[in-house]
Amino acid sequence: EDIYKINPKKLEPVDILVGGFPCQAFSVAGYRKGFKDPRGNLFYEIARFIDELKRKPKALMLENVKNLSSHDRGRTKKAIENILFDFGYYVHWQVYNTFKYTDIPQNRERTIITCFMNKNSYSYFLNNPIQKTSNLKPIASILQKKRINEKYYYFQDSQYYNMFKKEIKNRN
């Protein structure tokens, strides 16, 4: 549902609010219009949401592009921080690379803003860095070890070979 149409006062209290707002307004790949871009203003909808909930969440995690903290010479970061501080949050900004913390084989740096109402929770978070956990298995462990029946292969003498060869190279 469109966030503009949701009334936070009608929602049950939440302990943790996780969200993001469009990054195009802050990205070095975009025009970097920031809050002058309507998409950049969606942060203010998150702020409205927090403000109007029956009880402010105990913790927030917000995500955006790496460039967010340096956008507009740091003024964007300051504006966001001031709002979160006014709500009573302890605020921490950090850039994480998904490759370092996940099994995603891609270097993708993102700014993560973590906020806590409780100073002890905030301190605990800062003193216990996130560790990478991996559920990946070596590829050899999932490959089939027995010989595959030849009926599953298309050899050059197959009536479909040339068609498949052509389609595999087709960009459409």
Question: What are the residue ranges of the model-derived segments?
Answer:
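Core alpha/beta nucleotide-donor-binding catalytic domains of modification enzymes
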Residues: 1-56, 65-78, 85
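Short beta-strands and strand-loop turn motifs
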Residues: 59-65, 94
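Short glycine-biased active-site loop of nucleotidyltransferases that positions the nucleotide triphosphate
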Residues: 8-11, 102-106
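Short acidic/polar capping segments at secondary-structure boundaries
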Residues: 66-67, 98-101, 118-120
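Conserved S-adenosyl-L-methionine
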Residues: 1-2, 88-100
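A short helix->loop->beta-strand "cap" motif at the edges of active sites that frequently abuts
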Residues: 54-59, 109
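S-adenosyl-L-methionine-dependent DNA methyltransferase catalytic core
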Residues: 8, 83-87, 109-172
